[in-house]
Amino acid sequence: MEWDGILAGIDSGRYDIAANGIDVTEQRSEKYNFSTPYAFNRTALVVRGDNEDIKSFEDLKGKKTTNSIASTYMILAEEYGAEVVGVDTLDQTIMQVLTGRADATLNSEVSIADYMQKRPDANIKIVALTEEANLVAIPTRKTDDSASLLEAINQAIAELREEGKLSEISMKYFGRDITAETVGEAAE
């Protein structure tokens, strides 16, 4: 499923929840109830390896970025004055940057680190990270029926956190613990 269809599925009643690294935002909180955050993730600003013009989010003004459609990254790029081109996948955003069709992309620090680990020869670099981490949680519909579901999700997250399983899974797949509010520290 394409990214922009995930939340639409909740809106239409097709899904009760969505679990796909979804950031909690003020706008989304108006439409959905969110679980307790299970991860904390900063936004990475990524450019081609030879780009020396963009060093900070402020440098995006007047530049072209490529971002996942309807993502928090697209909104953030627009807030910094970038011209935004929407695509469906992370691979597409990186390809746009590599081919020079876009100057930069914004995405999850964890997703970019994973991409770079799997493709160490990719000619990209992270030039900036947001200071604040985004809260990552599971959205549910705002209905009376979803209250018990949200309670069960929160209980499961609490149990996994207390047992150390959330941290263990994070270390296994991301090489760092993104389940704690202190993010960005690589595994030793």
Segments (PLM) and residue ranges:
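Beta->alpha turn/N-cap motifs
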Residues: 1-4, 13-25, 48, 68-72, ...
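Periplasmic-binding protein-like
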Residues: 40-47, 113-154, 176-188
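A ligand-binding cleft/hinge motif common to bilobed small-molecule-binding domains
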Residues: 21-30, 76-79, 103-133
